[in-house]
A protein has these predicted regions:
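Short, amphipathic alpha-helical interaction segments positioned at domain boundaries
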Residues: 366-378
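Local cysteine-cluster metal-coordination motifs and their immediate loop/turn environment
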Residues: 11-22
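C-terminal scaffold of the Radical SAM
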Residues: 1-4, 24-48, 53-333
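Short amphipathic alpha-helical interaction segments
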Residues: 333-345
Length: 378
């Protein structure tokens, strides 16, 4: 029986962060229950469609899932348990941003079946959090983190961001050290990207954002990799670090080009050799009441050429790289027969490392990873 991951999108926030370009809104509390009812209907419909698939991972993202009321989250989780074949050892994660968490919420999430929480902290300094448009202070986070542990969560991820406007190396080092000292099981560290259509983008266009240099961005990144290793966090993907045995199963589904089903507003899926996503129109989604034919958009049949390229550039995000055996098993071909020229050139440039089991990015290759990935687009 083939396994899949589920992604559930919750498009509501208390306040939208200034750098965020995800489909989400603040101040729509009046539409939450209608949305949850529509999403419940989609979950039940898709459960019938994919009743023969085992679910090894469920991930609630957003937005801020914990902006919903406890009964709404319970309604969604109940629909998943009743509609899908969720494995006993499945990883069940929800994003839970500081400022929307409490012991009561954390305990309720545990009761619903969640066994992993992902907390978006981003920075340790309150002035930086305010600059990002975050609703929490670092004191709020610490209180929430203690509540999460008290509620029994033994698998917690903390999201951090570096290369923030005006951020010094000392500020970033303080952030990483303070978070590592709390010993979450998993840490994600992303470089800030200024996305078009966000308030940050408008400030950038107006020359009001003091961005760090490319050199400082890389210096921060390399320091993070080395420092987290000293704290016992193994880097397993370009931006992700975990204690032994705590890698995110849901993340690995994406990077190993395995199948996942997205449900909710704007959610993306990769199923049955096709990519598709749901509408980004909230009213359209709610009105459809779970009828996917009314809100599914941009269905794309993945050609073998596409599948080969995606397998390589997604897999190379993992520090273990792409194994020759997995490539052969997936496509019935040798990697060298398809990408021999590219592999040789990238290896000679010192951007790829090759051994008898497969290929992976070198440290320098990680720094120019997008340029490396482009080489696999045939």
């Amino acid at each position: 029986m083939e396994s899949i991951g589920l992604y559930i999108h919750i498009p509501f926030c208390r306040q939208k962060c200034l750098y965020c370009d995800f489909p989400s809104w603040a101040g729509r509390e009046g539409q939450m229950q209608m949305y949850v009812d529509a999403l419940t209907a989609e979950i039940r419909a898709q459960g019938k469609r994919y009743e023969n698939r085992e679910v090894i991972s469920v991930f609630f993202g957003g937005g801020t899932p914990t902006a919903l009321e406890i009964p709404m989250l319970a309604q969604l989780m109940q629909a998943i348990w009743e509609s899908f074949r969720v494995m006993a050892d499945a990883e069940l994660t929800t994003e839970a941003n500081p400022g929307t968490l409490s012991y009561e919420m954390a305990a309720a999430l545990k009761q619903m079946g969640f066994n992993r929480l992902s907390m978006g902290v981003q920075a340790w300094q309150n002035e930086k959090l305010k600059q990002l448009g975050r609703i929490h202070t670092i004191e709020d986070f610490l209180e929430n983190y203690r509540a999460v542990r008290q509620a029994g969560f033994e698998n917690v991820n903390v999201d951090l961001m570096f290369a923030l406007p005006g951020q010094s190396m000392a500020e970033w080092q303080e952030t990483v050290r303070q978070i590592a000292a709390l010993e979450p099981e998993h840490i994600s560290a992303y470089s800030l990207i200024i996305e078009e259509g966000t308030p940050f983008y408008e400030s950038y266009r107006a020359g009001k954002l003091e961005l760090v240099s490319e050199e400082m961005d890389r210096e921060m990144y390399h320091w993070t990799v080395d420092t987290l290793a000293e704290w016992g966090y193994g880097q397993y993907e370009i931006s992700n670090f975990a204690k032994a045995g705590r890698q995110s199963r849901h993340n690995r589904i994406y990077w190993q080009a395995e199948e996942y089903l997205g449900m909710g507003l704007g959610a993306h899926s990769y199923m049955d050799g096709k990519r598709f996503h749901n509408s980004y129109d909230l009213q359209k989604y709610i009105s459809a009441k779970g009828d996917t034919s009314l809100f599914r958009e941009d269905t794309e049949l993945i050609t073998e050429t596409d599948a080969l390229a995606e397998f390589m550039f997604l897999g190379l995000r993992l520090t273990e790289g792409v194994s020759f055996a997995r490539f052969r098993q997936r496509f019935g071909k040798e990697m060298d027969a398809v990408y021999g020229k590219e592999l040789q050139e990238l290896t000679e440039l010192g951007l790829l490392l090759r051994d008898e089991s497969g290929v992976r990015l070198s440290r320098r290759g990680i720094d120019v990873s997008n340029a490396v990935f482009e080489r696999f687009l045939l």
